[in-house]
Amino acid sequence: MKSPRNIFRAQGPTSEGFIVVVVLWLLGALSVLASIYSVYVVNSAAAFAVQDEQLRGEALFSAALELTAYKHLTQQTHPTSGQFSFHFGQANIAVKFRPETARIDLNAAPKQLLAGLFRALGARPDDADTYGERIVAWRTVQPNAQDSEASAYRVAGLGYQPRGAKFPHANELALVRDIPSSLTERALKFVTVYSGQPQVNILDAPTEVIAALPGMSPNQISAFLLQRDASPQDAKSLLPAEAQQFATVEGGKAIRVLTRIVFDNGRQQSAEAVIVITEDRERPFAILSWRDDSIGMLADSQQ
């Protein structure tokens, strides 16, 4: 029979081995926890950096709009369009602005101008005239709910009728019947609901809008685009007689502002807003629409 001393001596190495295993297990668990924590810290830092960048971007977008309004209000000859840039908050900011009168207003433009835009975008003349008629019918108040236009929408199985009021947003153009979606998508770059004018500003209008004016041949369009910058005061007289009634050189108070931000770390943000200049010194402008490329959505605010 072994003495107690011998028994403890025999069991000693086993106990020591068990303790070593436990210690190693604890060290392994701690190393895993340390790894998890380090990943958490890195991800949290990245998330906070992105959030900080978004907040800085919002502040810089607001600054761009304020500077645009300031230029419009303080310069003796109000620029109808232009661009400027500045560096602030570890970022380069480039701003371009153009009046909404450079676009065709869906609520105010006559049928001829609307049809002219679709012709300029490649539609056949007869089809373009039909599209122009459909837009005018959509925005026109119909005294009788059973009118032929509403009936046509029901027959087409669209499940809705013409609004019978102004377009609240240019994207509603997609609801007007018979206009191909491909044409609608292209037309959205050249239409607005914020101009309020039946004419277009020929000094700032893009080529497609100039081509929408009645009586403009390809040669006349090219000649006009070459001469309008050299003689802006004579721009209207450069147009054929039938186009002059649809032309203006007024900028209007609604301005579309495109802002692009490039941070020093290489990240970029951009936003497009439509603002209206007011006479209120405390609130010199109001935002009518906003589109941020980070969310790809357009929000409207009637302010």
Task: Locate predicted features.
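Compositionally biased linear targeting/interaction segments
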Residues: 2-9, 15-303
